[in-house]
Amino acid sequence: MNLIESINAAQLRTDIPDFRPGDTVRVHAKVVEGTRERIQMFEGVVIARKNSGINETYTVRKISNGVGVERIFPVHTPRVEQIEVIRHGKVRRAKLYYLRALTGKKARIAERRR
């Protein structure tokens, strides 16, 4: 293992739950406002996971006041306190970008049986 791989391996988090695109998650993100730091929750559907290793990210989409909001979080960042999986969705795609065009009941995802 070379130097870069050993540094990256030391920074990987091990407390990440198993989640896939289509799952509804609640992300507890640390937000710094001036000198204060607080936890902000962002709950939505995972529409994509990209890259691997230390560079891995996931995109979470939610509808807030009728407007679609998406946030991209790095998987291994210390800024994310916790990731809760609320429900597991049954989808047949790795990237759910088509959900951006759907509204209301059409944007629902069936629950996966475990």
Swiss-Prot record:
Under the heading SUPFAM superfamilies, the entry gives: Translation proteins SH3-like domain (SSF50104)
Cellular component per GO? cytosolic large ribosomal subunit
One of its Pfam families is: Ribosomal_L19
Single GO biological process annotation from the record: translation
Check the record and name the Gene3D superfamilies matching this protein: 2.30.30.790
Q: Which GO terms describe its molecular function?
A: structural constituent of ribosome
Q: Which UniProt keywords apply?
A: Ribonucleoprotein, Ribosomal protein
> What InterPro entries does UniProt report for this protein, alphabetically?
Ribosomal_bL19, Ribosomal_bL19_CS, Ribosomal_bL19_sf, Translation_prot_SH3-like_sf
What job does the chain carry out? This protein is located at the 30S-50S ribosomal subunit interface and may play a role in the structure and function of the aminoacyl-tRNA binding site.
Similarity-based family: Belongs to the bacterial ribosomal protein bL19 family.
The name on file for this protein is Large ribosomal subunit protein bL19
- The scientific name of the source species is Lactococcus lactis subsp. lactis (strain IL1403) (Streptococcus lactis)
